[in-house]
C-alpha cells in the first residue's frame, strides 16, 4: 500500500515539474498572433539570466506616460547571435531612445515578448520577426 502512495506522489511531482518547465518556456502569457510597436525612453536594462529585461517609458494615446516592460532571450544567446549586434551589459542605458516590437501580453498589461529593437540612431539591435 505505501509503495503505491510513494509511486503516486513521485508521479504527481514529475507531472508538476513538467508543467512548470512547459509554462516557463511557453509563450502562454503573450499573444503570438499579435504584434505591437512602442517607442520610448529606456528606464532600466537588465542583462541577466534567464531573460534579458528592458523597461521603458512610453507616451500613451492619452498623452500620459506608461511604463512598458519586455523580455528577450538569455544574455549568452544575445551575445553570441551572429544575426544581431553583439549584445553586452551596457548596450542600452537609461535615457536611450528605442523602438520595440513584440508579442503583447494576453492580459493587456504593458509588457511584451520582444522581437525587434531599434535604437535612436536607427540601428537594429535585434530582429527576430
Task: Say what each PLM segment does.
Residues 81-99:
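Short nucleic-acid-contacting surface segments enriched for D/E, G, S/T with interspersed K/R
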Residues 38-42:
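Conserved hydrophobic positions within beta-strands
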Residues 48-58:
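Short aromatic-glycine-enriched beta-strand elements
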Residues 1-9:
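Bacterial N-terminal signal peptides that target proteins for export
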Residues 103-128:
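OB-fold/S1-family single-stranded nucleic acid-binding modules
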Residues 22-36:
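Short boundary/loop segments of OB/S1/cold-shock single-stranded nucleic-acid-binding domains
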Amino acid at each position: 500500500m505505501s509503495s503505491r502512495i510513494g509511486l503516486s506522489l513521485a508521479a504527481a511531482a514529475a507531472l508538476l515539474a513538467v508543467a512548470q518547465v512547459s509554462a516557463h518556456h511557453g509563450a502562454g502569457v503573450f499573444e503570438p498572433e499579435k504584434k505591437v510597436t512602442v517607442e520610448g525612453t529606456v528606464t532600466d536594462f537588465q542583462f541577466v539570466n534567464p531573460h534579458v529585461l528592458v523597461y521603458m517609458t512610453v507616451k500613451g494615446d492619452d498623452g500620459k506616460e506608461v511604463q512598458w516592460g519586455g523580455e528577450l532571450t538569455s544574455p549568452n544567446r544575445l551575445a553570441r547571435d551572429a544575426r544581431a549586434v553583439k549584445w553586452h551589459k551596457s548596450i542600452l542605458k537609461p535615457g536611450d531612445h528605442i523602438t520595440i516590437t513584440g508579442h503583447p501580453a494576453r492580459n493587456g498589461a504593458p509588457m511584451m515578448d520582444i522581437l525587434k529593437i531599434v535604437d535612436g540612431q536607427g540601428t537594429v539591435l535585434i530582429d527576430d520577426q
